[in-house]
Design a protein with these regions (language model features):
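Sequence/structural segment immediately N-terminal to covalent heme-attachment motifs in c-type
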Residues: 29-33
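Conserved short histidine dyad/triad with adjacent acidic residue
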Residues: 125, 131, 136-158, 187-191
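Glycine- and acidic-residue-biased ligand/ion/polar-headgroup-sensing regions
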Residues: 148-151, 158-173
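Short acidic-glycine-tyrosine-enriched beta hairpin
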Residues: 173-193
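Short beta-strand His + acidic residue motifs that chelate non-heme Fe in jelly-roll/DSBH
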Residues: 43, 153-155, 174, 192-197
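Positively biased amphipathic helices and basic secretion/translocation or surface-docking motifs
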Residues: 1-11, 23-24, 48-117
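Ligand-binding loop in jelly-roll beta-barrel domains
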Residues: 190-214
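Short cysteine clusters
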Residues: 36-39
Length: 228
């Protein structure tokens, strides 16, 4: 099992607990929670605090967006319940959904109707060494990316927020090395160029609330065809 080194920012986790993250970003956090007990604990703390605040407020009718967020969270929590660590005596049993290279989180399996990354209908893009699967989301963009081993992504920054969860393989950039289970929580202040590890393809789940900002004329030229 990989040791998780990179987690979502605290404000991202509390926004998730409050149900205020756009759907694409919430999907990434939900999949990360399935393999990270540290972040699950933080989200539970945020939910407890939110519950206490709600009881102190006068009841109000939920907006359509708030209701949709609540229903989505309930669905995610149901999937996460299968991923809890269960202590038995002095031993700790970790579910198979732990961050092992090549293992797809059960929440993503439910959406994609598949368990094997290699069996997915990957679509080639005009960008060299990059395949993707677009995931329908009501808010933001979510997609599964497959970067060929040893291949670089174009240099880019962000017009908004981006969350990327490594599912298999890994990549490195100016922020460090990212492996299975790690999350890159990025905003407009970050410019980077992920480089996939040499030993295997890097598969990751990316969610964003605004398109990326590519650097260089060639990257800008192909951006409309990639869709990010």
């Amino acid at each position: 099992m990989s040791q998780i080194e990179h987690h979502p920012q605290d404000d991202t986790l509390f926004s998730y607990a409050a149900g205020s993250l756009p759907a694409a970003l919430a999907l990434v956090v939900g999949c990360h929670l399935q393999v990270c007990s540290t972040c699950r604990s933080q989200v539970r703390s945020g939910e407890s605090l939110g519950g206490e605040l709600m009881t102190a407020l006068a009841p109000k009718t939920l907006s359509d967006r708030a209701r949709a967020n609540v229903l989505q969270r309930l669905d995610m929590q149901q999937s996460q319940s299968d991923c809890e660590q269960v202590s038995v005596g002095s031993e700790t049993i970790v579910s198979p959904a732990a961050p092992v290279k090549g293992v797809m989180p059960s929440l993503l399996q439910k959406i994609l109707k598949e368990q094997d990354f290699d069996a997915l209908p990957w679509k080639k893009t005009i960008a060299p060494g990059l395949k993707q699967i677009v995931i329908d989301c009501d808010e933001g963009q979510a997609r599964l990316l497959r970067i060929t081993a040893g291949q670089k992504m174009p240099v880019h920054s962000h017009r908004g927020s981006e969350l990327t969860l490594i599912l298999s393989g890994g990549y490195s950039d100016t922020l460090g090395q990212f492996n299975a289970g790690d999350v890159a929580d990025l905003d407009g202040s970050t410019e980077h160029q992920p480089l996939a590890d040499d030993d295997m393809d890097c598969i990751c789940l990316a969610g964003m609330d605004a398109p990326l900002l590519f650097k260089g004329w060639l990257a800008k030229l192909i951006q409309p065809f990639v869709g990010m």
